């Protein structure tokens, strides 16, 4: 069989057309030109969710990307996360609105992020300088996924930042149907996700590794929802409220991920998962499927995901966050010392917190005053991004040790 030069040219043109570089300018428009030819991908939310879970996006570990995209080179996990986030958001848009116009989607998603984040920090005005919506969105998605290579190492990025990215998708779905109170909804979804993770870990046979992560989640809740003082199980009542099926499936998968991170499932963990699934209104077959899916995912990818190879996930999770916060404090030590010198009450309360528990009112003061400081120091903006609240307890724990001169005059006697 003979092939003409024109035949090879057609093959090359087709392959080249489906290529995409998610780190080069224009990648979102390229994604749009490809995805508009793939409308059969988005038939219902159930299949869309399953596809996203199979890539690892739901778990915060992006191992694959949609099959209609051919990367020009081996992609980093951040690059896969960018593609999967856009894929997840666009699929949600087409299913919720019955509109597949990509330009309209870009305008809507840009509007969504602006409404959701503009009250948190002034960083948007600095990063959204593109002349087109797609160019602006490229910068915004880069910020959502990477938060800057100077701030985050890849392991930290995949474990904490990307594991919360699916909340963006759930919020976007809510925003499309009812845009009011979207910030309150964001706070609630984060609160429920962290509560579920905490209680899933608490259902395990206690070991030091799991306790470190559980304590981290526990203390972070104070800053996510200041009127909740502890994990007393009241979050379960909110799960009984009328939540979307996609939210409920995500909550269950987060719990399964937490209990399976040590590659085993004990009776009490299984009991927690099935009890949670029942509260979420999910059928037993789906609960079993969720457990089996995370097991298969871990087995399939344990050799390629660094923190699944050797270390307990809780250890890696906590240690990488601590290293990263440590580095941020030291890099910004002079600016922080200046701010602390002007915030005597904050210094006093942080010193006090090293010896005894603060009251809810005191914790709220610490939160608000720290947020004001973070807003004034651009390189600390990560602490006020969605999901960044989980870092605050580590910051509060480390800063007296790393900047002792700022706390000497306010040392609390035991």
Label each residue range with its predicted role:
Residues 384-395:
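Transmembrane helix boundary and interhelical junction motifs in multipass membrane proteins
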């Amino acid at each position: 069989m003979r092939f003409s030069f024109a035949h090879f040219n057609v093959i090359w043109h087709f392959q080249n057309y489906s290529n995409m570089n998610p780190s080069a300018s224009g990648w979102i428009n390229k994604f749009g030109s490809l995805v508009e030819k793939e409308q059969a991908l988005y038939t219902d939310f159930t299949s869309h969710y399953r596809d996203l879970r199979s890539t690892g996006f739901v778990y915060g570990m992006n191992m694959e990307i949609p099959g209609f995209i051919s990367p020009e080179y081996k992609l980093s996990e951040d690059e896969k996360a960018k593609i999967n986030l856009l894929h997840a958001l666009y699929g949600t848009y087409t299913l919720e609105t019955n509109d597949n116009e990509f330009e309209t989607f870009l305008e809507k998603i840009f509007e969504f992020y602006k409404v959701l984040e503009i009250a948190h920090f002034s960083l948007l005005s600095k990063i959204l300088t593109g002349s087109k919506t797609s160019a602006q969105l490229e910068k915004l998605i880069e910020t959502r996924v990477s938060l800057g290579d100077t701030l985050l190492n890849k392991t930290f990025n995949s474990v904490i930042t990307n594991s919360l990215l699916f909340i963006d998708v759930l919020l976007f779905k809510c925003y499309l149907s009812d845009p009011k109170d979207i910030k309150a909804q964001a706070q609630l979804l984060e609160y429920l996700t962290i509560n579920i993770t905490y209680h899933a870990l608490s259902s395990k046979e206690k070991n030091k590794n799991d306790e470190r992560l559980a304590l981290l989640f526990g203390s972070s809740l104070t800053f996510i929802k200041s009127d909740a003082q502890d994990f007393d199980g009241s979050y379960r009542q909110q799960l009984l409220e009328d939540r979307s099926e996609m939210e409920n499936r995500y909550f269950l998968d987060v719990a399964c991920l937490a209990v399976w991170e040590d590659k085993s499932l004990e009776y009490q963990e299984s009991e927690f998962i099935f009890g949670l699934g029942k509260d979420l209104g999910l059928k037993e077959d789906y609960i079993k499927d969720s457990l089996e899916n995370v097991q298969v995912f871990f087995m399939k990818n344990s050799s390629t995901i660094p923190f699944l190879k050797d270390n307990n996930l809780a250890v890696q999770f906590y240690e990488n966050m601590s290293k990263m916060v440590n580095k941020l404090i030291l890099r910004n030590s002079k600016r922080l010392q200046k701010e602390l010198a002007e915030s005597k009450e904050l210094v006093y309360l942080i010193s006090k917190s090293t010896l005894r528990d603060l009251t809810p009112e005191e914790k709220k003061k610490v939160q608000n005053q720290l947020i004001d400081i973070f807003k004034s120091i651009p390189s600390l903006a990560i602490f006020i991004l969605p999901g960044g609240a989980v870092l605050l307890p580590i910051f509060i724990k480390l800063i007296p040790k790393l900047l002792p001169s700022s706390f000497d005059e306010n040392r609390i006697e035991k």
